[in-house]
């Protein structure tokens, strides 16, 4: 997830909504940014963003929380090829093992034509590393059935 995507999604949940889903444009004023920051603070949410290739070195950059705390990892469009899937799952497993209660939510196309990544490939790669990955029921969500289809996959250690 990127900060702009989180901001746009948050803006659809305000009362009244600052933007309607699918609209896509939101002028970021100091007031809107302050309201977003206040919402995060009031729910005790902290965000950490990193950029780089999926690798064990990237895992070292991600701050560790206390082992008895929880962790939620969000990922999207990270499994476009079998090599990318393997690299993503490798770092995902490292992060999921850091705490007792951890899960990842991964949004992806069911199949990436021409490059070979797939949701099924993600599930197989996770199982090979001792994790379970399963698709979350999402019938009726606009846009998920169109084209090759999209899935939301939850990953946890077992």
Residue ranges and their predicted role:
Residues 1-158:
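S-adenosylmethionine-dependent methyltransferases
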């Amino acid at each position: 997830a990127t900060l702009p995507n989180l901001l746009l999604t948050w803006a659809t949940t305000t009362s009244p909504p600052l933007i309607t889903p699918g609209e896509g444009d939101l002028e970021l004023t100091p007031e809107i940014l302050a309201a977003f920051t206040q919402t995060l603070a009031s729910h005790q949410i902290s965000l950490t963003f990193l950029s780089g290739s999926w690798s064990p070195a990237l895992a070292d950059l991600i701050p560790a929380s206390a082992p008895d705390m929880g962790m939620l990892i969000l990922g999207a469009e990270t499994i476009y090829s079998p090599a990318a899937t393997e690299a993503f799952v490798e770092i995902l497993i490292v992060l999921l093992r850091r705490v007792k209660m951890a899960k990842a939510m991964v949004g992806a196309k069911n199949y990436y034509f021409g490059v070979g990544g797939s949701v099924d490939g993600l599930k197989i790669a996770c199982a090979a590393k001792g994790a379970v990955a399963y698709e979350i029921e999402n019938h009726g969500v606009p846009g998920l059935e169109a084209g090759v289809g999209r899935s939301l996959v939850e990953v946890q250690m077992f």
